[in-house]
């Protein structure tokens, strides 16, 4: 029998263990009983904006990583998975993609993916925190690939709900907004009202015929408060739209299976069986993650996950 102290090192020994492996560490509280420690090479940038603490750090395993209010948001190593899953299924499902609205996404990565589609004529990105946009435009242009300078793009520094009060409609609406609760159960009052039935219903009212709404809808670990918050978001979206489908993929930097939910008001085969191969080939798109094969896998959930709802 192995002595317990050989399996579970006492916390008193933790500082020594960390110092011998990496000089700097980032601690992220995933829940009340689960903490993630990431080794950091360097803190590249830090600014307290009007809305949040913005930090950019070079992680030993994740590369350059965006941290907002102590939570990892975008990591160089796997952001392409998250953004491919958020953007490209919606672009395939929509009947037309001429006009696209992005809510949040101040890092410019979702915008970068939308602009890969030649049929996109106009994109409006609505971001409440101007410092987010300026940070990525100036410090990390290789992430955005010049997306903010594209002539098809209009940037609005505003609350996401403001544009929904205007007399405009869209073929695709993408929500890259931070979910209202983190894994520990703490509430984010800034985004809480952006995940209500009223808000999602307002989005549905701004979609053109056979338009598609895509939203990042949090993560799943099959334990703890993270799952409960995800289920609440999914049920709220389902209450506002006639048809919904949820995609699932593990994101290493989030330590969870992450989800994107797609919704529309018309029951069309384009959302249940979209022409992925044809759409990608016609537009000359060879994406890093999203393919016809990965599309099928994204929408194939294990029974234990389906039973959450």
What are these regions (language model features)?
Residues 2-55, 257-309:
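SAM/dcSAM-binding transferase cores
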Residues 67-68:
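A general beta-strand register signal
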Residues 216, 241-252:
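Conserved S-adenosyl-L-methionine
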């Amino acid at each position: 029998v192995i002595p317990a102290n050989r399996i579970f090192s006492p916390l008193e020994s933790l500082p020594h263990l960390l110092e011998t492996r990496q000089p700097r560490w980032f601690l992220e509280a995933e829940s009340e009983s689960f903490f993630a420690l990431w080794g950091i090479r360097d803190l590249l940038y830090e600014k307290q904006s009007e809305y949040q603490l913005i930090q950019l750090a070079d992680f030993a395993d994740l590369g350059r990583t965006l941290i907002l209010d102590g939570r990892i948001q975008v990591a160089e190593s796997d952001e392409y998975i998250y953004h491919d899953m958020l953007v490209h299924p919606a672009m395939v499902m929509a009947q037309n993609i001429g006009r696209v609205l992005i809510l949040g996404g101040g890092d410019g990565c979702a915008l970068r993916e939308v602009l890969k589609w030649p049929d996109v004529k106009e994109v409006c990105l609505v971001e409440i925190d101007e410092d987010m946009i300026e940070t990525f435009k100036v410090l990390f242009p290789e992430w955005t690939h010049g997306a903010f300078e594209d002539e098809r793009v209009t940037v609005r520094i505003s609350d996401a709900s403001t544009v929904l009060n205007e007399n405009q409609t869209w073929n695709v609406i993408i929500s890259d907004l931070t979910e209202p609760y983190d894994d520990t159960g703490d509430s984010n009052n800034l985004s809480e009202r952006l995940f209500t039935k009223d808000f999602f219903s307002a989005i549905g009212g701004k979609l053109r015929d056979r338009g598609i709404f895509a939203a990042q809808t949090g993560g799943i670990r099959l334990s703890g408060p993270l799952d409960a918050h995800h289920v609440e978001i999914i049920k709220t979206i389902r209450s506002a739209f006639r048809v919904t489908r949820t995609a699932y993929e593990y994101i290493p930097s989030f330590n969870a299976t992450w989800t994107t939910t797609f919704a529309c008001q018309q029951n069309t085969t384009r959302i249940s069986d979209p022409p992925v191969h044809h759409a990608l080939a016609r537009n000359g798109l060879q994406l890093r993650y999203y393919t016809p094969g990965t599309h099928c896998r994204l929408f194939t959930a294990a029974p234990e996950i389906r039973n959450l709802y």
